[in-house]
């Protein structure tokens, strides 16, 4: 199998891996930016740590690294349009994305999306290059939780809501 063919088959296989949709944001002396990401994973709860993978060619990387802090905003099912904005699918400029009334600064000064299922503010403790991506290890320092809303996942190259069904009485 050729390398390009294997790469495409791998990408097709990963499209079958349903993943939560997040907007990873940062603000500080290096600037403010954000990106939609599905390659986000918990690492450990002691101490709370998360892994975020971003394409090494992304113009956001110097901003994330320069600020040294970020927020992982776990989107709810009604925030698909915001996910599209931060994925660059709508053509909205970066600063305009943050001028929406749904943003506030968290205790670490990071952009936190109101209504997100969770906002995890943290400090970047390590960055490694693996193939085409940078892997950020983030030590979580502040957690904001919402009890409202359902999940939003990306599956087969499309966004899908994930709704909790009512449990039937036993």
UniProtKB/Swiss-Prot annotation:
Kind of enzyme, top EC level? oxidoreductase
Q: Which GO terms describe its biological process?
A: benzene-containing compound metabolic process; pyrimidine nucleobase catabolic process
> What Pfam families is this protein classified in?
Flavin_Reduct
The chemistry this enzyme catalyses reads: a reduced flavin + NAD(+) = an oxidized flavin + NADH + 2 H(+)
Keyword list (alphabetical) reads: Aromatic hydrocarbons catabolism, Flavoprotein, FMN, NAD, Oxidoreductase
The Enzyme Commission number assigned here is 1.5.1.36
Q: Which InterPro entries match?
A: Flavin_Rdtase-like_dom (IPR002563), HPA_mOase_red (IPR011982), NADH-dep_flavin_reductase (IPR050268), Split_barrel_FMN-bd (IPR012349)
Task: Name the pathway.
Answer: Aromatic compound metabolism; 4-hydroxyphenylacetate degradation; pyruvate and succinate semialdehyde from 4-hydroxyphenylacetate: step 1/7
Q: Which SUPFAM superfamilies match?
A: FMN-binding split barrel
The GO molecular function terms of this record are:
flavin reductase (NADH) activity; FMN binding; NAD binding; oxidoreductase activity, acting on NAD(P)H; riboflavin reductase (NADPH) activity
TM ranges: none
On assembly, the entry states: Homodimer. 4-HPA 3-monooxygenase consists of a reductase component HpaC and an oxygenase component HpaB.
What functional role does this protein have? Catalyzes the reduction of free flavins (FMN, FAD and riboflavin) by NADH. Subsequently, the reduced flavins diffuse to the large HpaB component or to other electron acceptors such as cytochrome c and Fe(3+) ion.
Could you say which protein family the record assigns here?
Belongs to the non-flavoprotein flavin reductase family. HpaC subfamily.
In its UniProt entry, what is this protein called?
Answer: 4-hydroxyphenylacetate 3-monooxygenase reductase component
UniProt source species: Salmonella typhimurium (strain LT2 / SGSC1412 / ATCC 700720)
Lineage, highest ranks first = Bacteria, Pseudomonadati, Pseudomonadota, Gammaproteobacteria, Enterobacterales
């Amino acid at each position: 199998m050729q390398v390009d063919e294997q790469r495409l088959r791998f990408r097709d296989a990963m499209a079958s891996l349903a993943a939560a949709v997040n907007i990873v944001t940062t603000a500080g002396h290096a600037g403010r930016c954000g990106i939609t990401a599905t390659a986000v994973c918990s690492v450990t709860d002691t101490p709370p740590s998360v892994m975020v993978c971003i394409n090494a060619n992304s113009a956001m990387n110097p901003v994330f690294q320069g600020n040294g802090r970020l927020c992982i905003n776990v989107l709810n099912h009604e925030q698909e349009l915001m996910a599209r904005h931060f994925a660059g699918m709508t053509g909205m400029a970066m600063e305009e994305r943050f001028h929406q009334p749904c943003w506030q600064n968290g205790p670490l000064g990071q952009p936190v999306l109101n209504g997100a299922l969770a906002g995890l503010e943290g400090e970047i403790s390590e960055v490694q290059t693996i193939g085409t991506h940078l892997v950020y290890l983030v030590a979580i320092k502040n957690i904001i939780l919402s009890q409202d809303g359902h999940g939003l996942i990306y599956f087969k190259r499309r966004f899908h809501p994930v709704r909790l069904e009512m449990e039937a009485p036993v």
